[in-house]
């Protein structure tokens, strides 16, 4: 594997682009934008920070923003893999970075942690059309720089919301597409009033039937922002919210059904008394989330700048579930709702200074989370023994988190700089689990009514050092070397399904950036060494959460090449690929009633090869045609690398056309956009799961295996018209 990585590095002739669009160049940026960036700069990597990262500007998002979620919009970036329950990138979707699932990808919005405090999942479905209110995204791979929230074990996304508009504007966006997809969005800005105040907002609606049967989405969102600024001050008050009603499509399909009826969805299926199959019409997921942020950025004396942010998030909702009656009618079906009601609030802060000799940042955060988990019956009848809306579990989770960090980038010479980053993070977490809520270790710690539940109370203290070197050899070549440690607490689901340990990661990065006449290249080698990594088993618990288990030693060793080639004035080619080795050491698993050793196995959900191309053709100033290609190599859905759990590789191509239809005197910014997804109609699945169960056979346990898959849509089209006044 090491020879492959070395040869690939030497033989690569691809080219790299890692720059923000011209609107973000320092020479053209306004003072208001400079102050605005203070909010995210404390967490973001700079050009001479010794970590691999990718910046995505608003202009890059607009081209492909027709209705799909952020994971779909960034799927062509290095080491990223996305998957969608409904098969279209609308509704429930998620990303993996370097093989690490969404619970291990740190996401912040204006520096505020967005990962759910207990599950650490990122529910993009709660942010429909949020990309329309995004100014830029930075994706860091590996541990990266210190950030707020849970540790990054595969990567991090740092999102900056919309910047102020100097002039008044009004915009309308409408999208139509396959599977009855429709998106309507309106946005506005007052421009600066009396040079100090600006108000802006967006209101969006997205509806789609989805590719999978009964996987529809009904999504609504808004974004409101008020800004006050003067020469040294910027204050932003934000309120953004989403309401999602989605059909449940997270069940997947088994291998045989995948061949015969790939759009099948078992959710809500039940039998009539006459034996006919029917589907419960309210098998829905219904959740609302409100987010509030107040950010105050201030230029102080002697070159210092400060940021203080307050935030509050309130989420509440449920999924309604029909528990199927057996075909023999001996067991009566029932209906329940499983609720979440949670509050998350806190403060972030940073103090920074930049000089010719050094850059320094001091920052941190204090956050509090309260979550309620409860289930209600939605029927009444003596055959069940419960009344309407009786609770069959009633649990909670509480989490307090504090972190503080100090970063120093010191220029030893004009060519060599040293980077240091120290973080202390403290977590206090307590929770209860009832058996019906999806967990509990079975120990008698307390009760709710007649139900036994489990209590936990945990405290973690983590110290995470990072350091590195950046060397500018000449105007064409930069090199960097870095080390970073990350430590991470288990999730609620981990506690509900076992007795987990916190995990630790030591991350080593070695990179080269080349800048030449018509191409740019970034080559990055990484070695990520884990202790007690919580890995996906491929199995799910009784409420659909993915089950993870600690393993002893494991690692990820890989090479990332990210490039851009400027062919001529009309053509350019962006290319990136990742080749990696992802291994468990001495993996053991209970199989056929025995603890069996499987040796060194490939980490599940970790393809050895990920590759992307974006070929851009601009025949004139008004038209851009892009072919966006995505290859994901084969991967295992199980940690034991069972042959039946191998997910096939796939190669997908999307065609994106943007036509500038601006009409002087009517709209100076009017665009017609077309996105043809999967133009070659490939039948593929980009995610799935694996499970085992034991039965007695001839007096001895026999293990049986199964898999399930999430099929994705074939060729489908989205057509959008953006008009800005």
Predicted regions and their residues:
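Short acidic/polar hinge/loop motifs at secondary-structure boundaries
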Residues: 113-141, 160
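Extracytoplasmic beta-strand/coil segments of soluble accessory domains associated
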Residues: 71-113, 135
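Face-selective signature of the C-terminal outer-membrane beta-barrel domain
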Residues: 234, 286-441, 470-472, 476-482, ...
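Gram-negative outer-membrane beta-barrel transporters
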Residues: 414, 527, 549-640
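C-terminal beta-signal and adjacent terminal beta-strands/loops
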Residues: 487, 573, 583, 633-636, ...
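N-terminal periplasmic "start-of-domain" segments of outer-membrane beta-barrel proteins
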Residues: 32-65, 94
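Transmembrane beta-barrel wall of Gram-negative outer-membrane proteins
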Residues: 176-207, 212-249, 284-287, 292-302, ...
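Membrane-embedded beta-barrel scaffold of Gram-negative outer-membrane proteins
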Residues: 299, 305-311, 472, 478-484, ...
């Amino acid at each position: 594997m090491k020879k492959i990585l070395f040869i690939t590095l030497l033989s690569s002739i691809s080219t790299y682009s890692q720059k923000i669009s011209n609107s973000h160049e320092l020479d053209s940026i306004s003072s208001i934008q400079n102050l605005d960036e203070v909010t995210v700069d404390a967490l973001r990597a700079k050009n001479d920070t010794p970590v691999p990262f990718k910046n995505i500007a608003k202009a890059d998002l607009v081209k492909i923003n027709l209705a799909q979620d952020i994971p779909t919009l960034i799927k062509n970036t290095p080491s990223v893999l996305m998957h969608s329950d409904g098969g279209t990138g609308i509704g429930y979707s998620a990303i993996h970075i370097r093989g690490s699932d969404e619970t291990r990808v740190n996401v912040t919005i204006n520096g505020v942690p967005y990962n759910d405090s207990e599950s650490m999942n990122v529910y993009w479905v709660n942010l429909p059309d949020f990309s329309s209110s995004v100014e830029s995204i930075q994706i860091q791979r590996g541990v990266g720089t210190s950030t707020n929230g849970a540790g990054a074990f595969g990567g991090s996304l740092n999102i900056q919301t919309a910047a102020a508009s100097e002039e008044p504007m009004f915009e309308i966006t409408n999208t139509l597409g396959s599977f009855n997809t429709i998106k309507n969005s309106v946005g506005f800005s007052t421009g600066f009033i009396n040079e100090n105040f600006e108000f802006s907002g967006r209101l969006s609606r997205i509806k789609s039937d989805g590719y999978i049967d009964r996987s529809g989405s009904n999504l609504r969102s808004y974004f409101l922002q008020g800004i006050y600024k003067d020469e040294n001050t910027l204050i932003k008050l934000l309120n953004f919210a989403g309401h999602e009603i989605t059909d449940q499509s997270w069940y997947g399909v088994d291998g045989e059904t995948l061949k015969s009826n790939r759009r099948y969805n078992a959710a809500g299926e039940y039998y009539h008394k006459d034996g006919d199959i029917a589907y419960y019409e309210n098998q829905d997921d219904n959740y609302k989330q409100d987010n509030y942020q107040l950010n105050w950025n201030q230029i102080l004396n002697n070159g210092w700048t400060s940021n203080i942010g307050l935030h509050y998030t309130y989420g509440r909702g449920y999924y309604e579930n029909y528990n199927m009656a057996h075909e023999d009618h001996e067991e009566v079906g029932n209906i329940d709702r499983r609720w979440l009601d949670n509050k998350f609030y806190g403060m972030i802060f940073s103090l920074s200074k930049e000089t010719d000799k050094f850059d320094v940042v001091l920052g941190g955060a204090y956050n509090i989370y309260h979550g309620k988990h409860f289930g209600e019956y939605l029927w009444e009848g003596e055959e069940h023994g419960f009344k309407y809306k009786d609770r069959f579990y009633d649990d909670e989770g509480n989490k307090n988190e504090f972190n503080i960090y100090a970063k120093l980038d010191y220029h030893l010479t004009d060519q060599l700089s040293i980077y240091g980053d120290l973080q202390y993070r403290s977590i206090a977490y307590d929770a209860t689990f009832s058996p019906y809520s999806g967990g509990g270790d079975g120990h008698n710690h307390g009760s709710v009514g007649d139900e036994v539940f489990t209590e936990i109370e945990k405290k973690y203290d983590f110290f995470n050092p990072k350091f590195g070197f950046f060397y500018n050899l000449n105007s064409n070549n930069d090199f960097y070397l870095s080390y970073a440690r990350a430590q991470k607490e288990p999730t609620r689901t981990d506690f509900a399904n076992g007795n987990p340990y916190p995990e630790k990661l030591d991350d080593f990065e070695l990179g080269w950036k080349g800048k030449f006449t018509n191409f740019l290249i970034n080559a990055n080698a990484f070695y990520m060494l884990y202790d007690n990594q919580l890995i996906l088993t491929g199995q799910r618990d009784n409420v659909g959460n993915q089950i993870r288990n600690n393993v002893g030693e494991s690692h990820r060793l890989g090479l990332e090449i990210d490039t851009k080639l400027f062919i001529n004035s009309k053509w350019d080619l962006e290319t990136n690929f990742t080749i990696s080795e992802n291994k468990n050491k001495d993996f053991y698993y209970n199989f056929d009633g025995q603890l069996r050793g499987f040796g060194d196995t490939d980490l599940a959900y970790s393809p050895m090869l990920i590759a992307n191309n974006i070929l851009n053709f601009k025949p004139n100033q008004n038209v851009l045609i892009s072919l966006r290609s995505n290859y994901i190599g084969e991967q295992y859905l199980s940690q034991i690398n069972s042959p039946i759990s191998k997910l096939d590789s796939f190669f997908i191509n999307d065609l994106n056309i943007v036509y500038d239809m601006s009409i002087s005197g009517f709209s100076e910014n009017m665009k017609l956009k077309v996105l043809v997804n999967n133009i070659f109609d490939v039948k593929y699945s980009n995610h799935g799961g694996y499970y085992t169960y034991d039965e007695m056979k001839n007096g001895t346990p026999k293990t049986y295996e199964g898999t399930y898959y999430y099929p994705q849509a074939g060729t489908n089209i989205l057509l959008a018209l953006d008009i800005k006044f």
